[in-house]
């Protein structure tokens, strides 16, 4: 199941079902995070995926009077483009890297975005980069880019 499939199931469900599905969705993203984390061969305490209010933050965007408006998942169903694909982002906010004492060293935003039914891993370090998830090599490339971002951040501190 892709993130996109999972998200489509979340809309218009009861809060109880929604919460359970959020957890499944978060697990899906944490899978990406763990692949990225395993690529790090630097001495860090832990890497964790932080989420908005303990759950992934799902939102749709739509255009209104020439400007883009962002709405959260509990306000209305996804907005569809003319070609039928939804304007949806799925964010797993930030990966926190801590030292052995649990002190935060750095945090690098890492999210998954759905665009034209393609899943993308988005990493914002010194540079912004998107990786279309079409096979495992894309995840490995994202992991390598993330690792480089981490090393650059650590060099600054």
What do the predicted segments below correspond to?
Residues 28, 99, 154-157:
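Low-complexity, intrinsically disordered/propeptide-like segments
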Residues 47-110:
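Amphipathic, interaction-prone secondary-structure segments
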Residues 1-57:
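Charge-rich, low-complexity N-terminal segments
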Residues 14-18, 22, 29, 81, ...:
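Intrinsic-disorder-associated interaction segments
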Residues 1, 5-12, 16, 68-72, ...:
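Alpha-helical context
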Residues 107-157:
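Glycine-rich, aromatic-bearing surface loops/beta-hairpins
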């Amino acid at each position: 199941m892709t993130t996109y499939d999972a998200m489509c199931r979340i809309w218009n469900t009861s809060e109880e079902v929604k919460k359970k599905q959020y957890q499944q969705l978060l697990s899906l993203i944490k899978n990406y995070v763990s692949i990225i984390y395993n690529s790090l061969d630097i001495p860090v305490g832990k890497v964790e995926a932080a989420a908005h209010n303990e759950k992934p933050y799902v939102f749709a965007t739509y255009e209104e009077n020439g400007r883009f408006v962002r709405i959260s998942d509990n306000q209305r169903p996804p907005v569809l483009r003319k070609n039928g694909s939804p304007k949806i982002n799925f964010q797993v906010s930030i990966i926190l890297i801590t030292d052995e004492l649990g002190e935060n060293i750095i945090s690098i935003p890492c999210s998954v975005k759905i665009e034209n039914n393609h899943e993308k891993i988005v990493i914002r370090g010194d540079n912004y980069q998107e990786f279309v998830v079409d096979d495992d090599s894309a995840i490995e490339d994202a992991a390598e880019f993330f690792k480089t971002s981490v090393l650059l951040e650590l060099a600054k501190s």
